[in-house]
């Protein structure tokens, strides 16, 4: 049995739909008119959306204000749209025309992002009823949630990315930052060895102490082994084994 607590009913503004409106109101099922649904923002998502229209259905082809796309956005993942279109005999058309309308409805649902789309045409008093059922994919998230929610992993990745944002030194630096960035405190031990004092090492990228694999091409520490900040580093100037 369907849980109507998770169902929204959209009704076109015509007389037959007014009877349905009263019926669903007695069942305490939320209902909204087509014009109101298109005009206002829906803040809740539903497992099921019923869309009823009698006689008038041209609004379903409106590309500038696509109601099916908006329905898709207010459905939960794997939520179901049930579209019910009544066409009276006085509206004209034959079975071929009705089939064309059903096919177009399926295409519009597909273009709006629905899957598992099916349709059924039934005879009714003084007309026919076209039923189209479509499902909202579970791999799509609601548009409103995309702006407000993210997984813990995504938040962690964003935080890590922010840590990597650094203020680089300009090639033609005139403020003195470049000079400070390449400054190394050195103490000569002998003619073959120099000791580098890294406690006050300055770097624009912050990766210099990790080793050459992480250093930029102009790194002042290029060629030095990896070191810990504050560690005294000795470099063999002749590149001979110690």
UniProtKB/Swiss-Prot annotation:
Residues 1-140 are annotated as: N-terminal SAM-like domain. One of its GO terms (biological process) is iron-sulfur cluster assembly. One of its GO terms (molecular function) is electron transfer activity. Keywords: 4Fe-4S, Cytoplasm, Iron, Iron-sulfur, Metal-binding, Mitochondrion. One of its GO terms (cellular component) is mitochondrial intermembrane space. It is found in: Cytoplasm; Mitochondrion intermembrane space. The C-terminal domain binds 2 Fe-S clusters but is otherwise mostly in an intrinsically disordered conformation. The N-terminal domain has structural similarity with S-adenosyl-L-methionine-dependent methyltransferases, but does not bind S-adenosyl-L-methionine. It is required for correct assembly of the 2 Fe-S clusters. Monomer. This is Anamorsin homolog. It comes from Plasmodium vivax (strain Salvador I).
């Amino acid at each position: 049995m369907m849980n109507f607590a998770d169902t929204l009913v959209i009704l076109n503004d015509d007389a037959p739909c007014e009877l349905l409106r009263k019926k669903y109101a007695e069942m305490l099922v939320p209902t909204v008119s087509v014009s109101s649904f298109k005009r206002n923002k829906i803040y809740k998502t539903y497992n099921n959306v019923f869309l009823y229209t009698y006689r008038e259905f041209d609004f379903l082809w409106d590309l500038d204000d696509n109601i099916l796309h908006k329905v898709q956005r207010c459905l939960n993942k794997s939520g179901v749209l049930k579209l019910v279109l009544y066409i009276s005999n006085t509206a004209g058309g034959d079975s071929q025309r009705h089939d064309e309308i059903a096919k177009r409805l399926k295409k519009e649902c597909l273009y709006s992002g629905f899957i598992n789309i099916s349709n059924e045409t039934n005879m009714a008093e003084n007309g026919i009823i076209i039923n189209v059922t479509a499902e909202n994919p579970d791999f799509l998230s609601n548009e409103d949630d995309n702006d407000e929610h993210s997984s813990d992993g995504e938040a962690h990745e964003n935080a890590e990315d922010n840590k990597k944002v650094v203020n680089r030194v300009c090639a033609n630096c005139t403020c003195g930052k470049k000079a400070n960035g390449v400054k190394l405190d050195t103490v000569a031990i002998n003619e073959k060895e120099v000791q580098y004092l890294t406690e006050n090492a300055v770097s624009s990228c912050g990766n210099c102490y990790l080793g050459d694999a992480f250093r930029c091409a102009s790194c002042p520490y290029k060629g030095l082994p990896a070191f810990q900040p504050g560690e005294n580093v000795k470099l063999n100037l002749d590149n001979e084994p110690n």
